Amino acid sequence: DDPHVSFLGAGYDKVIMLNSFSKTFAMTGWRIGYVLSPHKEAMEQVTKMQYYVTACSNDAMQYAVLEAMEKASSYPDEMRIEFQTRRDLITTRLNQMEGVSCHEPKGAFYVFPKFEIPGLNSEQLAIEMLNEGVLCSPGSAFGASGEGHLRFAYTISAHEIDRGMDRVKTVVDRLRSTNLSH
């Protein structure tokens, strides 16, 4: 939502750009990207390194990237609107739950809500969520200040987000009623 700040102000002749399609085209986990540079010698070294680290990306991924690139002119706007809808849905659903507070994220497609459930750390809470069929990351995996938080991705459909949030609410309600009554 914020304005783009270009790296080109530093001068293109000083730039080696590495990027992936993960965020731009929601191809997370695919590990497919590119390198751009006007420096022939640097690109020769990058090519050697890439050759020994990764033999190749599979054909299906390459065709998907090609398709995304061909439709790139309209895709980012459509995707941004879709992710705003998903973001609004997941943050609203989380903030409606007793003992849960969630700020609206401004960057990637993750939320990092705080859970007030006495007696449970974020790792234990993530396991409880997993047992209910919801995959998330414990906030403690992101440092000490993440304790009490969970990280959810909203890269799935709105319908799946709703189903997942129903399950999260079931876990939260059960744990809060059990832990607060003791």
Language-model regions: role of each:
Residues D1-H182:
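PLP-dependent class I/II
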